[in-house]
Amino acid sequence: RENMKRGAKNVKLMATGGVSVDGEQPTDVQLNEDELVAAVQEAHHKGFTAAAHAQGTFGIKNAVRSGVDSVEHAIYMDEEAADMMLARGTVIVPTLVAPWAINQHPDVLPEFMVKKAQEVADSHMDSMKLAVKRGVKMAMGTDAGTPYNDFQTAVVQELLMMQESGMTPAQVLLSATVSGAELLHVSDDAGELVNGKLADFVVLANNPLVDLRAFSKDRQVFKKGKLVFKS
């Protein structure tokens, strides 16, 4: 309630432990189902959305049952959790790049963090492959701000890793545009380049449906129809 009074339109709930904090494990349940339900109901009462950081099987299921709009990370997801998401329309924001980025710099980051990132990496990808196979809806997100996970280059790596999980380039692009806008309740203005919506778009030299690495160079970014970045 306090965060929403301050202007938050999405409430993120820490349903489980994580990789970046010492003294906890990704599988640790940090909020039980009743606690999650109380927060989700408050967000939805205001017409806002609720997301759950959930990296363990039990925490994921608690989050889905509580009615969150999305589950971030979804590591250690099993078939039951995937089917629950599919039945309830819960969206996954994979953030595959977050532990990947940590694992690229093992010599400069805290040992506890690197150890956990290495432990979850394979399970993270396996969970996304399961979700893709089941047909769970995805919305692209990077968890930017975690170590070596920046706002400039992480998106391309995330797109490539989502493709590695079994999504087609078209599905990946849909997750990064239409699906993200729908999840955040901004699809009236964003997510598609159509009449009546904001002219936010990227012009590329190459076709991303052929190679998603097209986003990594030779691009022009337009915001509300105005060029704001060129490489």
Model-derived features with residue positions:
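Short aromatic-centered micro-motifs
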Residues: 221
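Small/polar (Gly/Ser/Thr/Ala-rich) solvent-exposed segments
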Residues: 210
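Active-site loop ensemble at the mouth of alpha/beta enzyme cores that anchors a bound cofactor
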Residues: 95, 99-116
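Histidine/acidic residue-rich metal-binding segments in metalloenzymes
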Residues: 1-92, 118-138, 188
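His/Asp/Glu-enriched, well-ordered alpha-helical/loop segment
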Residues: 45-49, 109-112, 121-207
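Catalytic metal-binding/acid-base residues of hydrolase active sites
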Residues: 55, 97, 145
